[in-house]
Curated annotation (Swiss-Prot):
CDD domains named in the record: TFIIS_I, Zn-ribbon_TFIIS
Quaternary structure note: Interacts with EAF2. Associates with UBR5 and forms a transcription regulatory complex made of CDK9, Pol II, UBR5 and TCEA1/TFIIS. Part of TBP-based Pol II pre-initiation complex (PIC), in which Pol II core assembles with general transcription factors and other specific initiation factors including GTF2E1, GTF2E2, GTF2F1, GTF2F2, TCEA1, ERCC2, ERCC3, GTF2H2, GTF2H3, GTF2H4, GTF2H5, GTF2A1, GTF2A2, GTF2B and TBP; this large multi-subunit PIC complex mediates DNA unwinding and targets Pol II core to the transcription start site where the first phosphodiester bond forms.
Name of the gene encoding the protein in the UniProt record: TCEA1
Record-given protein name: Transcription elongation factor A protein 1
SUPFAM superfamilies listed in its UniProt record: Conserved domain common to transcription factors TFIIS, elongin A, CRSP70, Elongation factor TFIIS domain 2, Zinc beta-ribbon
Location of N-acetylmethionine modifications: 1
Amino acid sequence: MEDEVIRIAKKMDKMVQKKNAAGALDLLKELKNIPMTLELLQSTRIGMSVNAIRKQSTDEEVTSLAKSLIKSWKKLLDGPSTDKDSEEKKKDTAVTSQNSPEAREESSSSGNMSSRKDETNARDTYVSSFPRAPSTSDSVRLKCREMLAAALRTGDDYIAIGADEEELGSQIEEAIYQEIRNTDMKYKNRVRSRISNLKDAKNPNLRKNVLCGNIPPDLFARMTAEEMASDELKEMRKNLTKEAIREHQMAKTGGTQTDLFTCGKCKKKNCTYTQVQTRSADEPMTTFVVCNECGNRWKFC
């Protein structure tokens, strides 16, 4: 049964990626006939696939059946209720799914799952392991939340992942505000740097890690530019640092005095040079030159 659900989930994920939901209704009908369990929901993450289809489809029958399935599966996550007002709770699933102890316990107990859960209200299934961000009436903060959510929508990764980008954007903003406690320039610069890095086409993994919960909102709110940088940029910075250290060491080891080189700064020929094999053995050596008159340094291969 698990293999069957995984097969359906994979087909739905491909539909979302290709933005073509043809055949989604048949898959949803298959799911309706499968007796779902909590273990099956967690191991297959089918709820996220169904929710992604629901968000993308314009077919009313597809969205209606998807909502119905999600609503029935949410009851498995909530567990049996003994509250006398359970009927009222059912009318307000958005509130109970976020605040019930059962939902929070399930969120913290599934260590190998991401912070999203296969539970939903009529809007989405993404529920963070962090408390929902408190609402605010501050116009600056609201605008920043909107811009962060828009940055998280870059590349449409949030659809395939099934993340609630608006709630996630609010949580990131809330974490920034709680640290700075003001909406001054420091706050705005912090928000801008998050937005810039989330939109970076050369660093899609950062955005995906934030969306899927590998990087929690409060951690992302505090990350430095170096920590948010792409692997390519980190490697470049590492190499530049090594090069700077090597040049500094070369300057200390002395060298050979010569008048063969002309300083581009003071135009004099009183120089000292050192040759070092900085690349592979079959490539030319790098020559480091220091002007003994003005201290100007340069290198060439």
